[in-house]
UniProtKB/Swiss-Prot annotation:
Organism: Thermosipho africanus (strain TCF52B)
PROSITE patterns noted in UniProt: ADENYLOSUCCIN_SYN_1 (PS01266), ADENYLOSUCCIN_SYN_2 (PS00513)
Protein name: Adenylosuccinate synthetase
Top-level taxonomic group: Bacteria
Cofactor binding, note field: Binds 1 Mg(2+) ion per subunit.
Subcellular location: Cytoplasm
Cross-referenced CDD domains: AdSS (cd03108)
Record has Metal-binding as a keyword: yes
Oligomeric form and interacting partners: Homodimer.
EC number: 6.3.4.4
Pathway annotation from the record: Purine metabolism; AMP biosynthesis via de novo pathway; AMP from IMP: step 1/2
Record-listed GTP binding positions: 11-17, 39-41, 292, 318-320, 390-392
Recorded GO CC terms: cytoplasm
Its job: Plays an important role in the de novo pathway of purine nucleotide biosynthesis. Catalyzes the first committed step in the biosynthesis of AMP from IMP.
C-alpha cells in the first residue's frame, strides 16, 4: 500500500499532525521534496515536536523515516532535529537518507537573502533557508550531494569550483564548511545508497509526506510566489527517483485560509476580521515565526488544487478555531474582468480576482448541525468526501467521519 498526504492550500494546513495520525498504519514515512523551510508541528498528549526535515511519523509505534533524493538537506538543522527528537522521545528515529540528496550550504542562504533584497517590493517572501538556490545549483549541475562527502579530495575540489562561480556570478564568498562536515559525520550512519531506498519503498507500506502545499508548487502554484520544489503529488516519482504507484491521495485543507509571504490571496481578511482569525488560530509560522495572512476558505481555489493533485479524499483541520463565530464566509466564485467565474483556469487570474461569498451560520463545536452543514457544503462544491476532521492541536484529536 502506498499513499500520500499533501496540502491543498499555501501550506500550514496541519499536514504534520495528519501524517503522524495516518502513519500508524504504515512501515515508513517518506519525505520526497522541500527542505528545512517546512515546519510540521506534531503535538502529542505529553510533548510537542516540530519537524523541518524529519518526516512526521508516529513515535509511539515502530514507524521508520526516509529522506529521499528530492529533498535538499541542511545537515546542521537535521542533526539538531534528531537530538531534539531524542530528548523528547528517549530514542533515535529509524532513519534512512538517500546519498543522492543535495545539501544546503551557507552560501545558498546568503544568495537567498540577496535575491530577496534585490527584488525589493517584488520579493517572494522566502524563509531565507537557501532552498531555492540549492535547487538551482542542482539544475546548474554544481550542487553538492551527500555522496560527494565520501571522497574528501573531490569534495574540496568541488567546493573550490563553487567558490569561484559564486564569487564571479553573485559576489558571494563561500564560507568555511567545517560545521557541515561535522554534521555529515554525525549523520553518516543514516546515509545509504539510493538502491536501498528503492528497495525499502518497494517492499513496505509507504506513506509519502509532501511539504508546503499545492498552491506553492514550483509548476502549478501561484508562480512566482512559490517554493523551489515540486510539492504537488506529481513530485513523488522525481522525489524518490523511480516510478512508484500511489493508491491514496489524501489532501489536507484548513477550514479557513492562510498564506505566508507575498502573492495573490483573493479572500484575505483585513483589519479586525483577519486579526481575529489569526489570534484564534495562533497563525504564526513554525519556521519563521512570521504572522500569517489570514482569510476565508476559497472553494474555487480548493477545487483547482484538488484537480491538479488528484486528491481522492480530504481531511479538514482547524474547524474548531472558528467555534463560536456567528457567521462564516466562504468564497464560491470570483469576479474577473467583469465576468463571474466559479473556477480558475490559470492561477495568474488570482491577481485580479474579486471574491464572491456565501455566508453560512457558525457553530458551537464539531457536533453542531451547522458544522456538519459546513462540511456538506464543501463536499458538494468540490465533489470529494471529507473523511477526517481535526478538532484540536493534538494527534489524538483527529476524528474519522
Amino acid at each position: 500500500m502506498k499513499s500520500v498526504i499533501f496540502g491543498l492550500q499555501w501550506g500550514d494546513e496541519g499536514k504534520g499532525k495528519v501524517t503522524t495520525y495516518f502513519s500508524k498504519d504504515y512501515d515508513y514515512v517518506v519525505r520526497y521534496s522541500g527542505g528545512s523551510n517546512a515546519g510540521h508541528t506534531v503535538e502529542y498528549t505529553d510533548f510537542k515536536l516540530i519537524h523541518h526535515l524529519l518526516p512526521s511519523f508516529y513515535v509511539k509505534k515502530n514507524v521508520g523515516a526516509i529522506i529521499s533524493n528530492g529533498v535538499v538537506l541542511d545537515l546542521e538543522q537535521l542533526v539538531e532535529e534528531i537530538e531534539e527528537f531524542k530528548s523528547k522521545t528517549g530514542t533515535y528515529p529509524k532513519l534512512y537518507i538517500s546519498e543522492l540528496a543535495h545539501v544546503v550550504l551557507p552560501h545558498h542562504k546568503k544568495l537567498d537573502e540577496k535575491l530577496e533584497q534585490i527584488k525589493g517590493k517584488n520579493a517572494v517572501g522566502t524563509t531565507k533557508r537557501g532552498i531555492g538556490p540549492a535547487y538551482a545549483d542542482k539544475v546548474h549541475r554544481i550542487g553538492i550531494r551527500l555522496s560527494d562527502f565520501k571522497n574528501k579530495d573531490k569534495f574540496y575540489e568541488k567546493i573550490k569550483n563553487i567558490s569561484k562561480l559564486y564569487k564571479n556570478l553573485y559576489n558571494i564568498e563561500v564560507e568555511s564548511i567545517e560545521n557541515v562536515l561535522t554534521s555529515y559525520e554525525k549523520l553518516k550512519s543514516h546515509i545509504v545508497p539510493h538502491g536501498e531506498i528503492i528497495n525499502l519503498i518497494n517492499q513496505n507500506k509507504i506513506l509519502f509526506e509532501s511539504t508546503q502545499g499545492v498552491l506553492l508548487d514550483i509548476d502549478v502554484g501561484t508562480y512566482p510566489y512559490v517554493t523551489g520544489a515540486n510539492c504537488n503529488t506529481t513530485g513523488i516519482q522525481n522525489g524518490v527517483g523511480f516510478p512508484v504507484k500511489t493508491e491514496n491521495y489524501i489532501g489536507v485543507f484548513k477550514a479557513y485560509l492562510t498564506r505566508v509571504g507575498n502573492g495573490p490571496f483573493p479572500t484575505e481578511a483585513f483589519g479586525k476580521e483577519g486579526e481575529e482569525i489569526r489570534k484564534r488560530g495562533h497563525e504564526f509560522g513554525a519556521t519563521t515565526g512570521r504572522p500569517r495572512r489570514c482569510g476565508w476558505l476559497d472553494l474555487p481555489l480548493l477545487k483547482y488544487a484538488i484537480t491538479v493533485s488528484g486528491a481522492t479524499e480530504l481531511v479538514m483541520t482547524k474547524g474548531d478555531i472558528l467555534n463560536g463565530m456567528e457567521k462564516i464566509k466562504v468564497c464560491v466564485a470570483y469576479k474577473i474582468d467583469g465576468n463571474i467565474v466559479d473556477r480558475i483556469s490559470s492561477v495568474d487570474d488570482l491577481e485580479k480576482a474579486e471574491p464572491i461569498y456565501e455566508t453560512l451560520d457558525g457553530w458551537e463545536n464539531h457536533t453542531s448541525k451547522e458544522f456538519n452543514e459546513y462540511l456538506s457544503f464543501i463536499e458538494s462544491y468540490v465533489k470529494r468526501k471529507i473523511t477526517h476532521i481535526s478538532v484540536g492541536p493534538k494527534v489524538e484529536e483527529i476524528i474519522k467521519l
